[in-house]
């Protein structure tokens, strides 16, 4: 058997956000958020699209969104690449999920708590040893929690999890092991298969149960991730080399440091642009010089946004619409 990689957005949504994934998501959230205690007995899987209430505010797409316990909202995101400003995007998505609960004129007491759960395939907090970390709003000096315990941020850093199959003890361990290793497995381990929800997750993740269009979409996304990882590595190396040369030409130590920093930034942006153009041409056809010029004029953040959006483009008209919308925001 071959299993799809639950770390890709397509697979993650299919496993945890499908109409028949309710029991899987309950087990997963209880394992990660509540140390496998059955705190969540029921939930409602919601549309992960956060439509803005105010014209001009950025649209948001989450991987999975659910109403748990009748009132609290959990937003879940799987992130493979450590992209620029990702930590700010988490804050933005959480506060937006909190604020869109109210309509104009409604009372603030109608607001319900939001938990933002983020699973990363990279280390976000190198100074922390724990695999799961939790953040909330506290007073800076005395660490007293804010009066309204409304926002919580939970992170699972997969690279920090190093338990083997034989070392798995808790349901939490088993779900994290599934997230980290499912793609490399060729059968369902007995240690995981004895959990009904995990066994069902493996069934959904079995490539044999996907139709050709789903397999093609999955392959495109995995190729994109690998290309982007390679482009970032290459761009960083080129940027460092350019920065060192620039600093040496300036002849000062400060110039070398500044040159390296600027070179890395410029190199990464150029590498991302090259990668995005290549991915676009795979999806929608050859781009004209005008399209390439428009893409080159985008900021680093806009390039990142385009890199996420292009996977859903079906034609050049989709790209045209996206560029027009984002050029109007500049």
Question: Which residue ranges define each predicted feature?
Answer:
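Elongated, amphipathic alpha-helical interaction scaffolds
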Residues: 1-330
